[in-house]
Amino acid sequence: MSAKWEKLEGNQGVLTVEVDAEKVNEGLDEAFKKVVKKVQIPGFRKGKIPRSLFEKRFGVESLYADALDILLPEAYAKAVEETGIEPVDRPEIDVEQMEKGKSLIFTAKVTVKPEVTLGEYKGLEVEKLDDTVTDEDVEQELKRLQERHAELVVKEEGTVENGDTVVIDFEGFVDGEAFEGGKAENYSLVIGSGTFIPGFEEQLIGMAAGEEKDIEVTFPEEYHAEQLAGKPAVFKIKLHEIKTKQLPALDDEFAKDVDEEVETLDALKEKIKERLTKEKKEEAEAALRDAVVQKATENAQMDIPEVMVKNETDRMIREFEQRLQMQGLNLDLYYQFSGQDEAALREQMKEEAEKRVRVTLTLEAIVKAENIDVTEEEVEKELQEMASLYNLSVDKLKELLGTLDGLKEDLKMRKAIDFLVENSKVVA
C-alpha cells in the first residue's frame, strides 16, 4: 500500500491511497462470504453458491460496495499513520479505481489539526494571588455557618422585611383570566431570593400576617412561557405567616453543634482557619496555572478549523446534559424553562469551546517542543489514584478505559502546565 499527502489551503489536504491488487482480492473474498449467505438460487442451499456462478449471475461489481466497507477503514487508518497527519473530522472519500485484479485507488479530503506557532511560553510573568487567611475571613465563615444553622421562627409582630420567609396563597391573572401554573396555597417564599419575576417579592415587603393584597407585575419579555412573555399580570395575595431567621449565639455550644470534633469556639476558629488556608493555597495554585496557560495561549498563533470548535461544543453540550440528568432534568426541560433553544445554547458555548481548543492545541505544541513524555510508573500511579477515587480495582479501571492513550495525553498536558509554572516568573 502507498499513501501520499498533499496539503491544500487552510487546514485541508488530500490523501491519495493505493491498495495492492492482492489486498483488493482478499476484500472481495470477504465480501463474497458475507453476501452469499443472503442469496438464494434454485438448486443450491443458501450460502453454498459457487463463486463463479455468483459472479456470472450477479457480476463481480455487486461485491464492490461490501468490499469497500472492508478495505477502506483499514487502508485509511494505515495511510493516516504512515503520513503522520492528524485528522479532526471524517474524510470525504472518493473512489477512483475499484476493480477485481487491480489495485484500489481512492482519495480522502481531510481536515487536519492546524499548525501552531508558539510565541513566548518560557519566563512568563504572572501574579500569584494572596493566599493569606485573615481574622476577617474566619469571622465571615463563622457568619455563614451561623446563617446555615439559623432557625426560622414565626414573627408575631411587625411586617415583612427583606430576608424573611413568608407563607402565602396566590393566584395570577392575565387579562382577567387565570393561567396555568399561576396558583398555589401555603407557598413558602424567601423575600429577596429572586424566585419570582421582578417586582413580585418587593411588593410583599411591608405586608402583615393575615393581610390580603393585589400586586401588579409584568412578565419579562424573555419569559419561558411564550403566552405570558411581556404581559402585565395581577396576583391576588393572602399572607398567612411571616418567619424570620433566629441566629444561634456564637459560643462553645454552637461550635460543638457545627463540628463534633471540637469543644470550644476558639478550636472551631482554628479549624476554620486551617481549612481556609488550604483552600486559598489551592485556589492560588490553580489561578497561577490558569494564568500561565492563558498567557502561553495568547502568545501562540493558529488557524482553528470550525469543525474543531463544533466538536468541542458538542462535547460541552453532552457534559451539560449529563449534569442536568444528575438533577433529574433534561435538555428539553432546560430549553423550556430558560426560553433558549439548541442554537442559542450552542452560540452561548461557542466562545468557551474555541478557548478550550486553543488551550489544548497550545499545550500539545509545548509537549512536542519540549519532548514531554510520561513514564509507565506515572501512568500506573495515576491509575491507582483514579481507582481509589472511584472505589475500583486497577484492573477493572483499565477494562473500563479500554485504551490508556487518553490518560497518557492528559498526563502530558498536566506536565506541560507544570513546565510552564516551573519556568515562569511569579510576582507578588
From Swiss-Prot:
Q: Which residues cross the membrane?
A: none
What are the protein's GO molecular function terms? Answer: peptidyl-prolyl cis-trans isomerase activity; protein folding chaperone; ribosome binding
Query: Catalyses which reaction?
Result: [protein]-peptidylproline (omega=180) = [protein]-peptidylproline (omega=0)
Tell me the PROSITE patterns matching this sequence: FKBP_PPIASE
List locations, semicolon-separated: Cytoplasm
Question: At the top level of its lineage, which domain of life is listed?
Answer: Bacteria
Q: Which residues form the PPIase FKBP-type domain?
A: 163-248
Give the GO biological process terms: 'de novo' cotranslational protein folding; cell division; chaperone-mediated protein folding; protein transport; protein unfolding
Q: What is its EC number?
A: 5.2.1.8
Acetylation keyword on record? no
For this UniProt record, give its keywords in alphabetical order, as a comma-separated list: Cell cycle, Cell division, Chaperone, Cytoplasm, Isomerase, Rotamase
Q: What GO terms fall under cellular component here?
A: cytoplasm
What is the UniProt domain comment for this protein? Consists of 3 domains; the N-terminus binds the ribosome, the middle domain has PPIase activity, while the C-terminus has intrinsic chaperone activity on its own.
Instruction: Give the UniProt family note.
Output: Belongs to the FKBP-type PPIase family. Tig subfamily.
Q: What does this protein do?
A: Involved in protein export. Acts as a chaperone by maintaining the newly synthesized protein in an open conformation. Functions as a peptidyl-prolyl cis-trans isomerase.
Q: What is this protein called?
A: Trigger factor
Q: From which source organism is this entry?
A: Anoxybacillus flavithermus (strain DSM 21510 / WK1)
